[in-house]
Design a protein with these regions (language model features):
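Glycine-rich phosphate- or other oxyanion-binding loops that anchor nucleotides, phosphorylated ligands
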Residues: 3, 7, 14-211
Length: 211
C-alpha cells in the first residue's frame, strides 16, 4: 500500500523521516503552513501520484484541557478502516479538530475556540487536505500530536512573524528575539516540547505505516 504523509514543516516530520528513509511506497510532502499552501502542495502531488491513503500529520494546539503534551490524536472522516484500529492500538486518541486560519497563541484564544467549535485540538491544514482527497475518493486521516496545551500561552505571537503566505519569516523572528531577549528561555523550552511531541508522533506513525 502506498501512503502520502503531509506535514506543514520539516521539524514535525524529522523523527519519522529517520524511520521511513528510503521505504518504498511511503511519500512525504512538506506543504507549508495554512490551507492554501496545503491545498496547492497536495494537488501538485496527486496530479502525478495516486496513493492508497493520505495522512495529514504534524503539530496541533490543545483545546481540550484533558489533552497533554505529546498526546497523539486523530480524526477519521472517511469510512472506518484498518487505520482507525491501528491508531487505537498505538495509543492515539480520537479527537475533533478545528482548522484555523491563524495560530492560536494564547490560553484565552484556545478557550474561545473550544467554546465556539467544540473541538479538542486546532491546526491549520487538514481541512484543505481532506477536501482534495475527498474529490479523488482517497481515504484521508488526520494524525496530529499536541505540541502546546490548552493551559499554556506561546512565548511569541507567531502570527505577527509570518510572511503573507503564512510561513514563518525568520528575519522577523530574529528581530523579535533581539527586542525581547527575555523570551529566549521560553523559546528554548518550546523547542524542547516540540521535539518531544515530534518523537511521540513518529512512534505512532511507525506503528500504523509499517505494521
Amino acid at each position: 500500500m502506498s501512503i502520502l504523509l503531509c506535514f506543514a514543516l520539516k521539524e514535525e516530520a524529522a523523527p519519522f523521516r529517520k524511520i521511513a528513509a528510503d521505504q518504498p511506497g511511503i511519500f512525504t510532502v512538506f506543504t507549508g503552513i495554512g490551507r492554501q499552501n496545503a491545498e496547492k502542495s497536495v494537488r501538485s502531488f496527486l496530479a502525478t501520484n495516486s496513493p492508497d491513503l493520505v495522512l495529514t500529520c504534524g503539530f496541533a494546539g490543545g483545546l481540550n484541557p484533558e489533552l497533554k503534551l505529546g498526546d497523539v490524536v486523530f480524526e477519521v472522516q472517511s469510512p472506518k478502516s484498518k487505520v482507525e484500529s491501528q491508531l487505537f492500538a498505538a495509543g492515539a486518541k480520537p479527537a475533533k479538530f478545528f482548522c484555523a486560519d491563524r495560530i492560536a497563541t494564547t490560553i484565552a484564544e484556545k478557550k474561545k475556540l473550544r467554546a465556539e467549535s467544540g473541538a479538542d485540538a486546532v491546526e491549520m491544514e487538514s481541512a484543505a487536505i481532506h477536501a482534495v482527497c475527498d474529490e479523488r475518493g482517497i481515504p484521508c486521516v488526520t494524525v496530529r500530536v499536541i505540541s502546546d496545551t490548552a493551559s499554556e500561552d506561546l512565548p511569541l505571537d507567531f502570527n505577527a512573524l509570518a510572511k503573507p503566505d503564512k510561513n514563518l519569516d525568520y528575519g522577523k523572528l530574529a528581530w523579535a528575539i533581539a527586542k525581547s531577549p527575555g523570551k529566549i528561555g521560553a523559546l528554548i523550552e518550546l523547542q524542547k516540547k516540540t521535539s518531544f511531541a515530534a518523537e511521540q508522533l513518529a512512534a505512532v506513525l511507525d506503528k500504523i505505516v509499517f505494521d
